[in-house]
């Protein structure tokens, strides 16, 4: 049998996770937005005349590829924290359901 759910601990875990989740989301959004700026910077620096050639050069540039790896890490960090939050919320809902069932059993026994 699994250990009982402690709703107070779950809420405390949510309070501790929330700032980290917010920071991770901010980092992910920044990385997504900066990707556009980086592409423009690299296109301009490519020295190519056509937009297609500039874009190809920018997308294959090591700085752009490195940025994508950073974006990947930012998304992973955010999603990990988000799913921890979802799991904690689900645990609280399970506890609420168990408590409601216990109240029904108590009323039926009375």
Task: Annotate each PLM feature.
Residues 1-2, 107-110:
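Short intrinsically disordered terminal tails
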Residues 1-19:
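Short, charge-rich amphipathic alpha-helices with coiled-coil/heptad character
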Residues 25-28, 32, 36-37, 69-102:
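Long amphipathic alpha-helical coiled-coil segments
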Residues 8, 50-51, 56, 106-108:
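N-terminal cationic amphipathic segment used for targeting or macromolecule association
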Residues 28-58:
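Extended alpha-helical coiled-coil "stalk/arm" regions
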Residues 48-77:
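Short, glycine/alanine-rich amphipathic alpha-helical segment
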Residues 9-12, 61, 98-105:
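Short A/G/S/P-biased low-complexity tracts
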